[in-house]
């Protein structure tokens, strides 16, 4: 009995050490999303540049698209912005979600840095971000023609991320036949 009591702390230590050691090989930027394979959450939000124009989840259907969560307060969003602009110029459909931001600042940002978005919506109170499980900005979702979330990137979408992760999936979604 005394021996078991003495070995218990050692056993607990070994179990904790194994989990900590295993964690050294995990990618901290890889944050799984429970929404992969599920429809984009329902929303009805105004456009940043024209609040009378609204976008809903139904508007995301028809073509594969990127949905990019961004904010003027986000330094990493500024880093990825030129790549998003390049992709939009190549015909990639990109929607923006301006997350917890001031609308006037967002309009100024888009006017100064160019607007890569087919439409960017204002999620000023963060409700859609909460439904998406947003950890912060930038985050980018790849959705298919039916509005199903197929992939999520947490962090900057740069040329490497586009080339290695998103472009192959995007092309695959473009090549899929229409659902009947």
From Swiss-Prot:
CDD domains named in the record: TlpA_like_DsbE
The keyword Transmembrane helix belongs to this UniProt entry's keyword annotation: yes
Transmembrane segments: 5-25
Organism domain of life: Bacteria
Membrane association type: Single-pass membrane protein
Gene Ontology CC: outer membrane-bounded periplasmic space; plasma membrane
Topological domain ranges for the Cytoplasmic compartment: 1-4
One GO process term, biological-process aspect: cytochrome complex assembly
Keywords: Cell inner membrane, Cell membrane, Cytochrome c-type biogenesis, Disulfide bond, Membrane, Redox-active center, Transmembrane, Transmembrane helix
Key word Signal present: no
Domain Thioredoxin: 34-175
Disulfide bond annotation, renumbered to this chain: 74-77
Protein family membership: Belongs to the thioredoxin family. DsbE subfamily.
Cross-referenced NCBIfam families: dsbE (TIGR00385)
Name of this chain's protein: Thiol:disulfide interchange protein DsbE
The encoding gene: dsbE
